[in-house]
Amino acid sequence: MEDFIVISDDSGSESSAGTRSGRARRLRRALSRTPGALPRRTVDFIDLTRENRARTKDRNGLCVIDLTRNEEENRPIATLDLTLEPVASSQKEPTSLQTCTSLSGKEVMEAHEDRGSQPAAQRIINNDPVDLDLLEENLFEGSRPPTSISQDSVYPPEPNCSSITYKGDLSFLTSLQLSSDVSSFSSTSNQRASLPCPQQDVPCQSQGLLCPLQALSCPQTASPCPPRASSCPPQALSCPPQALSCPSQTLQCQLQALPQPPQEVPCSTQNVPCPQQNMPSTPQGLSWHPRHTLYPYQDTLGLPQDVPGRPQNMSYPQDVTQLQDMPWSLHDMPLSLQDVLQSLQDVPPLLGDVPPSPEVMQLPGYVTQTSRDVIQSPAGVTQSLGSMMQSPGSVTQSLRSVMQSSGSVTQSLRSVMQSSGSVTQSLRSVMQSSGSVMQSPGGVTQSLRSVTQSPGGVMQSPGGVMQSPRDVMQSPRDVMQSPRDVMQSPRGVTQSLGSMMQSPGGVMQSLRSVMQSSGGVTQSLRSVMQSPGGVMQSPGGVTQSPRGMIKSPGMMLSPGDVIQSLNSVPQSSRDRMQSAGHVPSASGDAIQSPGGMSPTSRDRMQSPGGVSLATEDSIQLPGGVPLSSDVIQSQGGVPLSSKDRMQSPGGVPPSSGDMIQSQGGVPQSLGDAIQSAGGVPQSSGDAIQSPGGVSLATGDSIQLPGGVPLSSGDVIQSQGGVPRSSRDRMQSPGGVPPSSGGVIQSPGGVSPASGDAIQSPGSVLPASGDAIQSAGGVLLASGDAIQSPRSVPQSPSGTLRSPGNMSESLGDTPNLSGDVSNSPQALLDLARDRPKSSPNDVQNRDTPMDISASSSSSCSANPQSRQSEFKLDKVPWLTITDSSARREKSLPQLANPGSAQIQGQIPQVGVYNRPCLHRLKYFLRPPVHHLFFQTLIPDKDTRESKGQKLEPIPHRRLRMVTNTIEENFPLGTVQFLMDFVSPQHYPPREIVAHIVQKILLSGSETVDVLKEAYMLLMKIQQLHPANAKTVEWDWKLLTYVMEEEGQTLPGRVLFLRYVVQTLEDDFQQILRRQRQHLQQSIANTVLSCDKQPHNVRDVIKWLVKAVTENELTPPQDETQTSPRTGVLKTSSDHLSPRPNQNKNTNQLIVCQLQRMLSIAVEVDRTPTCSSNKIAEMMFGFVLDIPERSQREMFFTTMESHLLRCKVLEIIFLHSCETPTRLPLSLAQTLYFLNNSTSLLKCQSDKTQWQTWDELVEHLQFLLSSYQHVLREHLRSSVIDRKDLIIKRIKPKPQQGDDITVLDVEKQIEAFRSRLVHILGEPLVPQLQDKVHLLKLLLFYAADLNPDTEPASEH
């Protein structure tokens, strides 16, 4: 369709009237923020027609969105008021127009004469003026998720095109209502009802909660709808990009896709308040996407997506019905599971004003959310506690694609097609035409368990309202609420905890497999389903049982026992239901569904769209949106079983008692088997199957289609046809049912093995017993392997089939405690031998769920959850048929529960090696602990490749920062800057200086503020690294902090870390870009041995002071505790004694100062000369270190191996009676071994052997560092070193390195003799071990093999 939008602007005042030109013009920006500066420009028409004609405003000058298509009809269908001022009820637009409330939160109507006198209103988005010219281009970028639109920020003071996000709440959407103008579709009547919707009655959350767009359903009373009104044209269902130029137009699809309900139905929709409803408060905005999208996008308009928050109470305005309560056109035939095709005349519309239960969540137009974990996807995909998917335009969503035609709906597991004639459903695509529907409008069969009418407490009203004396709940209109968890779907679907299921075609499923036809109402003992076209209650009368009934005017839930049919349909003796013209179900507990689909009477529920829900706690939503406290059935023919079985659409019936007959005449026998439709496996016990191949376990599991997070329950099933069985078995896609107790015959004539075998679609036969075959390679639990919170037992035997051909035995699958269900996204822990999970085991977080990434993405944080490590979309089909072989393979996998996790977590080499290789090229030493080290290079490359122009933070935002500074509110200053600093915007130098000097180095700030300030500085350093011209600290400030009064500042260590970070980042930046300009670096300015040797001496002095101020601890204790205490310092400072606090602080300072010295060695491009100079300065300080433990700390923390070699060499040279002229080499080390004595002080009272032990230890340090110097080319300049390492140039042979085995043996023996002479025999074992280690190090350094080169003594 080549629809276009004609937008004309009003360049005059509001008083100007008359016909305006129809040529398209863009909205222009208001050039002044002062009120009344320029006349206000408003949208007159948004017309989707192709005819060129004069566009006239209504008499009040309101903006019109014309959705009409015929040229002869000049009356627009809907009016969207974009102005700020309401209009009085007396000044409504002509009767041919439908009014929508204005986007502001003010009154709906206001006198027309007042509008011209008010100041011009401007558009504001995100508190910034918006240029509507560019809003269209920016809206589809999707780079930033819009949050919401604030009530008080609809009109801007000044234009700004850069911001496309919405902040604040979406309360204006609450007031946006669509009145069903019945007469607008009729040529004989022009009457319409005014629908005032006061704003004060609708409290909205501030985080972008979308109040449902609701439409008053006023069915036609005179003549049937014309073809244009009966079905939505395809072009009306897709929102063109141009329609998104204003926020109100994004709802255009929903506004157009509302055909009127059948005629001859009374419209009693006025003044029916909707109870408050829970909505997740996830502040994620969602940008609009095309309607055919089945999976949630990253961004959708104002709808929470990935992370469901705690439910928020919301009240809805009166006289409002859901946009999707009217999905069926006059030609749509409601389809019930009983094969009943009810004509629209016999279908009572119960759509209007269905008050959802306190736990029901209604989203505008197409969003249905449950009280626990509902997630709405942009394409109308509703995700509920289990896994709900709602398509916006009464479009059922299938596993992969949904297709809606004007006439009817066809749902299949993989594709749903709606045609005008009827609803067709198939195992993969079953088409059911109106003629093929077997059920007549007059009769509803009821099972034996659901007695026709209970004598006590039954009230039958002409409207079919029944009440029971016990547990009766009456909802205002057609809402059936259960005492536990009732959920209302946008198409008037009520779902109760007792497993209420509503299918759009009027399908009702009962706990014992009750089915409701459009003409009649069947209610089961535990589950009731209500459809909008054929609500469970028939007009003739509904009987309610006296026990545990839930009564709604249009819907009756009889949890107790009774199901009353409209025309007194007889019940079968055992819960058997026979559909007309079809094969009766097997005796016992079999139920025959219309299209060959027979749900079991025991615990099965069949939804009309191929959606079957189990009883107990299942909830089925029409159009694939199921909600329930425990069981959730997904759309597209995905059945869910709360108890033991599931019936899939497409005619695959499971039998609870004895046999299940599938549509193809294939009987299925299962005690607890579950047949999924279209190859969607489902678990018998408590599994839940989602439409896109996503199966959810029962209990409280939640399946989210398309990456929506899961359930509070315990079982989580990921997409890709991965079912989880909570009880004993699961059916994999392909339509192969599993058999629980006997043989199960799949519709294709495939029979799985008896016992407990499960047949997977790809001719995969799982072994008998309790084996479970996962579809798509996802782990399936069988044999009661998964325990649902509803006390589903776990069987000790069974196998788990993991995606990567990993079968795991379910014998030790952990039980799921009932407490786990308390978490909205409780995860099933399938690790072997793990005890029952508790609420603490489950992360109580609303994490976004990516089903494509893992079977349960919430499990990713749980190391024992094995399902989270595998990509479902990349797992091949499992073809193992031998159960014993599979069990054998499962044992080693279970023995090593972390193996799967390790395999899943192997990083890609290219991604993680880049920073490491970068560091290796230049330093080959541990980098500074930069919080963003691995992202430094990608960010730099991205900025360079895009050529982004850096700009300072805008002046208006800086005013907010300066205000906090003036008010002495440092936390606000830091938080504002944290938000305002971005890759494109950098803070001014004076602001950074204020953060460093006035906040980080403040003596009065709390630890939290100091940490926030440090994180801000790290973010600025990451995005905009400082250089020699922009650095905001100098050596004078550093000296003050390290020496004078600054030693008592609480932010002293954080400041030192920031200083070292700036030195390191700037040094590496220059090495990457301008290697020949190291003299321009900050490090060269302050740490050059040639330019600033006194600064280097200061660093050495601070280093020795920090080392000697440490607590006197034994060497072994010091080496063991120092790293750990350093890590724990920040979290345990307030608990640790003061000495430990100082000790930890000193250790951190030592590491930072050592890093500064390692940089000082490199900055002058002459590492050998610089190391010699620094070693000379350091020698005197080292001799003054009193304790060995302190000297050990001094040498072990030294990062530069070249510097350590030089310092040790100077110490040994001064300790030798006869200094050697040998250069630093292996021969020099051998010389030191027998000619040096210890110059270092040792104040301990222990024996003299520790002095020699320290000398040997220093020789080991010397040998080790010397190897690093040779192999890493540390004597070469850092600029040349990169090429030497890349080319793998071997180090040049050094004079004095050509020692032999004989030389080593001789010198070691001479040293032993020397020790024996001084210390006496026997030598201390510790000293003997160190001498032997030194010998081995010498052999290794000289690349000698003592076995091949025997010594002279031998």
Swiss-Prot record:
Motif SUMO interaction motif 2 (SIM): positions: 64-68
Keywords: Nucleus, Protease inhibitor
Biased composition (Low complexity): 432-444, 732-752, 852-867
Composition-biased stretches (Polar residues): 445-455, 788-825, 1111-1130
One MF term in the entry's GO annotations: peptidase inhibitor activity
Annotated Basic residues bias: 22-31
Biological function: Inhibits the protease activity of CAPN3. May play a role in SMC5-SMC6 complex recruitment for viral restriction. Forms a complex with SLF2 and this complex is required to recruit SMC5-SMC6 complex to PML nuclear bodies and sites of viral replication.
Subunit organization: Forms a heterodimer with SLF2. Interacts (via SIM domains) with SUMO1 and SUMO2. Interacts with CAPN3 and CTBP1. Interacts with SMC6 and ZNF451.
The protein's name: SUMO-interacting motif-containing protein 1
Organism: Mus musculus (Mouse)
Classification lineage: Eukaryota, Metazoa, Chordata, Craniata, Vertebrata
